[in-house]
Amino acid sequence: MKTPADTGFAFPDWAYKPESSPGSRQIQLWHFILELLRKEEYQGVIAWQGDYGEFVIKDPDEVARLWGVRKCKPQMNYDKLSRALRYYYNKRILHKTKGKRFTYKFNFNKLVLVNYPFIDVGLAGGAVPQSAPPVPSGGSHFRFPPSTPSEVLSPTEDPRSPPACSSSSSSLFSAVVARRLGRGSVSDCSDGTSELEEPLGEDPRARPPGPPDLGAFRGPPLARLPHDPGVFRVYPRPRGGPEPLSPFPVSPLAGPGSLLPPQLSPALPMTPTHLAYTPSPTLSPMYPSGGGGPSGSGGGSHFSFSPEDMKRYLQAHTQSVYNYHLSPRAFLHYPGLVVPQPQRPDKCPLPPMAPETPPVPSSASSSSSSSSSPFKFKLQPPPLGRRQRAAGEKAVAGADKSGGSAGGLAEGAGALAPPPPPPQIKVEPISEGESEEVEVTDISDEDEEDGEVFKTPRAPPAPPKPEPGEAPGASQCMPLKLRFKRRWSEDCRLEGGGGPAGGFEDEGEDKKVRGEGPGEAGGPLTPRRVSSDLQHATAQLSLEHRDS
């Protein structure tokens, strides 16, 4: 790793790997793009333009060739390189600028410290040029947990609202807040500062004439922290003119006499976005106290880049999956500030398992579940299905039937659900294939004498008479298809001369077997008997005419 003095550049180790061997995976594409943007010899190939963090690729083929040389891939072209850039869209590292060709924009406030957790800002060397991008609003590559809920505020809100600070905050914190409120600056990068400033011993010819910046800001001069002199240092302000390698085409500085305080560290944001930003997250009163550092007053110890602090910092950033701008990482513990925490899907309490309870209507259960109650509620079982309801109705109908009113209630139950077969009728089920082979004794005389007797094919003695109320249910035993089939076979036997009497007896026997009552036996068979008699008479007349 070259020293910052050698390279003239002070990106941290994780952001730029100049000593990585060709073909290695130690450097990423966005690191390489930042490397090209900082070098003046590649200004005709790629350069900053437009908004903060926006750059344009002027020669896509040359950029792809340089990337291929760096990665030892001679077949690299811009098509492959653009696919690699699209991979960064989901990573929130950069995105494509709509309406502009070959123009992309870095999301510097989304570049978080994940893969390179242990860095020491105090050892960042001496050379801090202006060629690197400035500190973005709300954070930088060194993204600390926000000390205020400023990320969830809209940009149109008043940035000069007084900060929420406690009376126990340190005098240093109060002085910084007073200066920033007096300045009224909104954006962290409104002054064109970079996170990597120029060194104290830079070339005086590069600075335009003007009063020095250190004595230009209001308030007392910023004292160095006595307990840790290596972490925070006072850095000079940048030049007042436009910078050729800065993301800003024109520096937003009003002039050399702007009232700006010196920068504490290139890794820390300078001015608040909406509320007061602090030099370190642990200088804020919103940071939980109890640090064990030398400065126990105010918000606790300073951020020391210890493994515990870095672990706590990384855990805060891993919670930004759901509700990114309403994540709990934006609301640190502060006793005087009540912030409603968002409902996260992974922290919703699971309802307990519901025991067997009597069913309730679905509307009532939905209303009870939708209403938020402070106590735990039990879920009701789902309503009964069609089979369970039918079984319940059968049980109720059977109880009412055994109670006494058999006829009327049986008809009502039959209208709601199919009733069970009547126990009084002794009928053997006959399938469609076996129906033609059933042999029944001749009961044609009984049909005329005693039509109310139902007989089975194999039981010579007459069974008990059925109740008149159950006769309609018994008439449904024979399927309609079988009934038409037997009528057709009977007509065929009559036309073929097989004797109408035998066919008539078979039909009567089938009706007896299927358990039809006397009313039905006389009703549907009467027109059929007439038709069979007419057919028999016409057959006899035709035979007589043929004989004569």
From Swiss-Prot:
Signal peptide: none annotated. Residues 27-107 bind DNA. Residues 289-301 have a biased composition (Gly residues). The modification Phosphoserine is found at residues 20, 24, 185, 190, 327, 431, 435, 444, 531-532, 548. Residues 532-541 have a biased composition (Polar residues). PROSITE patterns: ETS_DOMAIN_1, ETS_DOMAIN_2, ETS_DOMAIN_3. Residues 348-361 have a biased composition (Pro residues). It is found in: Nucleus. Residues 362-373, 394-403 have a biased composition (Low complexity). Potent transcriptional repressor that binds to the H1 element of the Ets2 promoter. May regulate other genes involved in cellular proliferation. Required for extraembryonic ectoderm differentiation, ectoplacental cone cavity closure, and chorioallantoic attachment. May be important for regulating trophoblast stem cell differentiation. It is linked to Craniosynostosis 4: A primary abnormality of skull growth involving premature fusion of one or more cranial sutures. The growth velocity of the skull often cannot match that of the developing brain resulting in an abnormal head shape and, in some cases, increased intracranial pressure, which must be treated promptly to avoid permanent neurodevelopmental disability. Chitayat syndrome: An autosomal dominant syndrome characterized by hyperphalangism, partial syndactyly, bilateral accessory phalanx resulting in shortened index fingers, hallux valgus, brachydactyly, facial anomalies, diffuse bronchomalacia, and respiratory distress at birth and in infancy. Belongs to the ETS family. This is ETS domain-containing transcription factor ERF.
